[in-house]
UniProtKB/Swiss-Prot annotation:
Pfam families: KH_dom-like, MMR_HSR1. GTPase that plays an essential role in the late steps of ribosome biogenesis. This is GTPase Der. The keyword Repeat applies. One of its GO terms (biological process) is ribosome biogenesis. The keyword Cytoplasm does not apply. Residues 372-454 form the KH-like domain. GTP 1 binds at residues 31-38, 78-82, 140-143. GTP 2 binds at residues 204-211, 251-255, 316-319. Keywords: GTP-binding, Nucleotide-binding, Repeat, Ribosome biogenesis. Residues 25-188, 198-371 form the EngA-type G domain. InterPro entries: G_ENGA (IPR031166), GTP-bd (IPR006073), GTPase_Der (IPR016484), KH_dom-like (IPR032859), KH_dom-like_a/b (IPR015946), P-loop_NTPase (IPR027417), Small_GTP-bd (IPR005225). Belongs to the TRAFAC class TrmE-Era-EngA-EngB-Septin-like GTPase superfamily. EngA (Der) GTPase family.
Length: 461
């Protein structure tokens, strides 16, 4: 690490091949844009995971999913459309597909039989033949005898038998999977893909730097990064070693607009962002420190709060923040982020690598708080002292009493107070502040539920 707190060699954080071997064989699904790759991935998974729309270029990253077939686990990778002469953003997408070709244990090349073998298909076939990988040719969109005849013409690609399938309707997919898995090493059904890894979701509005941060941490172009807002559509899982442990990062699509206003693949991606937050344990919320806080920031933050996840606020693009902007930002935080004063805060630059290593202790502290349990005895001793010093406000001419307190659950810490009457929201916020002052909980939300007990002898009818 250099003196300014940045990493001089990001490759120190990247998993090598031996680290990744324990997570099972990888099957990459590649091909030109709009040949049905994501539809095939969804068919393999048996559920709608990959974002699908009848428009070329919807999938832009290589996205990994835990899959199972006939009791055997493996990883299936969806990729963006591969084009040999692509430029700009399309070239970056094509590079992701090329990486998948190189790193996977087996490759399924998908070709549209209705179009036939194109120059791009032939170029992909040549690359795959030279790679020495296990390659299976999927002749997609076969729905009848003519399709089967068209599939036979794909022998010309030199990849062996074309497997006639219809990813949309499921035709031939089972036979294809049987042959793919027969060629792969066995993976025990009990193998866990996560292996107990802590799950991290990267969230924030479009173009805030989520993919850039993921790439900086992983040391490679794991997510497609482009100046155009919203270039990440699918959540992208990455296993990254930091601080002596491996973390599972999910790079979520930016929410360009409210879910109700989204359309097409933007809608599905926004739904997937909700899912990524729900499946995570700790969330890194990226905020553009160089610009004023926006309604989009607030909406994404509300999603995290509602999910009850541990939280780290990462103020990105700190290299663009001058002294005047820093003063303005502090006032914005005090005014607009009052509901998450408990969150861990790190000022970073995903572009330069400034202070990104500070994310590790921030996540660890947040997760430790999120996992915390307080024994019932010490909790009730504490609550009695607090109530004696500051009793609950009178309500309806009566002052409610807190009879008993217990922590019902962790993740997030949830407390239940048994009382003789309703506790005002302001008093519950007061109790939360005092809980944090005494027990910490930095980086984790706290939930306080109140249960009003009836008087003894009062029978329900």
């Amino acid at each position: 690490m250099s003196q300014d707190g940045t990493w001089s060699d990001e490759s120190d954080w990247e998993l090598d091949d031996s680290d990744l071997a324990e997570f099972g064989p990888v099957v990459a699904v590649v091909g030109r844009p709009n040949v049905g790759k994501s539809t095939l991935v969804n068919r393999i998974l048996g559920r709608r995971e990959a974002v699908v729309q009848d428009v070329p270029g919807v999938t832009r990253d290589r996205v990994s999913y835990d899959a199972m077939w006939t009791g055997r686990r493996f990883v299936v990778q969806d990729t963006g459309g591969w084009e040999p002469d692509a430029k700009g953003l399309k070239r970056l997408v094509a590079e992701q597909a090329s990486v998948a070709m190189r790193t996977a244990d087996a490759v399924i090349l998908v070709v549209d039989v209705g179009v036939g073998a194109t120059d791009a298909d032939e170029a992909a076939a040549r690359i795959l033949l030279r790679s020495g990988k296990l390659v299976f040719l999927a002749a997609n969109k076969v729905d009848g005898e003519k399709g089967e005849s068209d599939a036979s013409a794909l022998w010309s690609l030199g990849l062996g038998e074309p497997h006639a399938i219809s990813a949309m309707h499921g035709r031939g997919v089972a036979d294809l999977l049987d042959k793919v898995l027969a060629a792969l090493p066995n993976v025990a059904e009990s193998t866990s893909l996560d292996g107990g890894l802590r799950r991290v979701a990267l969230v924030g509005k479009p173009n805030v730097g989520k993919s850039s941060l993921l790439n900086k941490l992983a040391g490679d172009q794991r997510s497609v990064v482009h100046e155009a807002a919203g270039t990440t559509v699918d959540p992208v899982d990455s296993l990254i070693e930091m601080g002596g442990r491996v973390w599972r990062f999910v790079d979520t699509a930016g929410l360009r607009r409210k879910v109700g206003q989204a359309s097409g693949h933007e809608f599905y991606a926004s739904v997937r962002t909700h899912g990524a937050i729900d499946s995570a344990e700790v969330v890194i919320m990226l905020i553009d420190a160089s610009e004023p806080l926006t309604g989009q920031d607030q909406r994404v933050l509300s999603m995290v709060i509602d999910a009850g996840r541990a939280l780290v606020l990462a103020f990105n693009k700190w290299d663009l923040v001058d002294e005047d902007r820093c003063d303005l930002l502090e006032r914005e935080i005090d005014r607009e982020l009052v509901q998450v004063r408990w969150a861990q805060r790190v000022n970073i630059s995903a572009k330069t690598g400034r202070a990104v290593q500070k994310l590790v202790p921030a996540m660890e502290n947040s997760l430790a708080s999120w996992d915390t349990r307080i024994a019932t005895g010490p909790l009730n001793i504490w609550i009695k002292a607090v109530v004696a010093a500051t009793p609950p406000p009178v309500r309806g001419g009566k002052q409610p009493r807190i009879l008993f307190a217990t922590q019902a659950t962790a993740r997030p810490p949830t407390f239940v107070l048994f009382t003789t009457g309703f506790l005002e929201a302001c008093y519950r916020r007061f109790l939360e502040r005092r809980l944090r002052e005494t027990f910490g909980f930095e980086g984790s939300p706290i939930r306080i539920n109140v249960r009003v007990r009836e008087k003894r002898g009062l029978k329900r009818r």
